[in-house]
Regions:
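The feature marks the mature, well-folded catalytic cores of soluble enzymes
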Residues: 1-367
């Protein structure tokens, strides 16, 4: 079964930005954002950092005040930083299935590490190095020989005959997957015969009993073909938080309104409507808003979204965009969805300059 993100976790993975990536024009700001994420994670659970320059990254982490007793660094060549989409997707064997901490069974079934192919969101960008990270980590026995990560009992499963990105699927931990039609049915990813093929695939690999297809919703500047983690997210107690646009003149208004109506029509496995909580859509942010704007990027609108939050043990990390009212409203919605967790905001304006945000650069590994 594919666990819900709020179930107990072993650690989180970050793939660190470096000078040979598209982050180069504003690398210091990107690395500072990653340091803020790393500090927040290591207050609650261990952290795996993947980088081609381990000595430099270790120095950054130490100087940044990160608890190094919680950190494992893996040396590996990388194209970019989007761990959500190139990292392992983990399932749990049946005797550890559960939708909450209370359902977790200590000492139950093992974790299965699914290694899918990542092809740069439908061959838009180079991904040859990122696509080898999982195999390198596993072959180096990084998981097997490390007490910090504590995932020695995980089983590797080669799924590289299929293309799948972690940001394209949401699980409620009870057998339901929420996913965007546009992304999964993209011709540049998999050659499948429609939704029924995916339903069989998700049942075989993830134990999914149901797939809810989201047909509407998008963000300008998004390279992923509308990843679900930018639009709508499962939360505990049959809740979905989603992005809502309140400005009829905004280009997103109609599509997000249609998405909202579709979400209202979805039902839980028990046949009841989901509890829906609306996140605000951030005010428009453009590349030209930054003093060091890259001329080649033009004046494009960037895909800022509060739906791109990360749930970790005891906390929710969510992106902020220097918009005090919207940032605060988003925090209040997330507190409503996760009342027992600390809600921690992290300025992610630099991340959207490369068309992702906080959830996109992280991947959690469940217990």
């Amino acid at each position: 079964m594919l666990p819900a993100e709020w179930e107990p976790q072993r650690f989180v993975q970050l793939t660190w930005p470096h000078a040979d990536t598209d982050w180069a024009p504003y690398l210091d700001a990107a690395q500072e954002c990653f340091l803020n994420i790393a500090r927040a994670i290591t207050l609650h659970e261990p952290l795996l950092v993947v980088t081609p320059t381990p000595e430099d990254v270790e120095a950054q982490l130490r100087e940044g005040g990160v608890d190094m007793s919680q950190v494992v660094i893996e040396e590996c060549p990388t194209n970019d930083t989007w761990a959500r989409d190139h990292a392992f997707i983990c399932t749990r064997e049946p005797d550890k299935i559960g939708g909450s901490t209370d359902d977790y069974v200590e000492g139950g079934g093992n974790i299965i590490l699914h290694d899918f192919t990542f092809n740069g969101w439908g061959m838009k960008f180079a991904a040859n190095l990122d696509n080898q990270i999982n195999r390198t980590i596993y072959d180096d026995d990084t998981f097997a020989d490390n007490d910090i990560l504590d995932i020695w009992d995980a089983t590797y499963q080669d799924n590289r005959d299929k293309i799948l990105e972690g940001g394209s699927i949401e699980s409620d931990g009870k057998g339901t997957i929420l996913t965007p039609t546009e992304c999964l049915l993209s011709a540049n990813r998999n050659i499948f015969e429609g939704k029924s093929s995916f339903k069989r695939w998700f049942f075989d690999d993830f134990g999914a009993q149901r797939v809810l297809w989201l047909d509407d919703g998008f963000l300008l500047g998004d390279d992923t073909d509308s990843h679900i983690d930018t639009l709508a997210r499962f939360c505990p107690n049959d809740t979905i938080v989603y992005v809502k646009c309140e400005d009829p003149d905004d280009i997103h208004y109609d599509a997000l309104k249609q998405m909202e109506e579709q979400l209202k029509g979805f039902s839980t496995v028990d046949g009841k409507p989901f509890r829906l909580l609306a996140l605000p859509l951030p005010a428009p942010i453009h590349e030209s808003d930054f003093p060091d704007a890259v001329a080649s990027e033009g004046d494009q609108r960037l895909p800022a979204t509060y739906a791109n939050f990360l749930v970790i043990n005891g906390a929710v990390l969510y992106p902020t965009y220097n918009q005090p009212d919207n940032d605060q409203r988003a925090a209040e919605v997330l507190h409503d969805a996760f009342p027992d967790r600390e809600i921690i905001g992290i300025d992610c304006r630099v991340l959207i300059r490369q068309h992702g945000s906080l959830h996109c650069v992280t991947m959690q590994y469940p217990k």
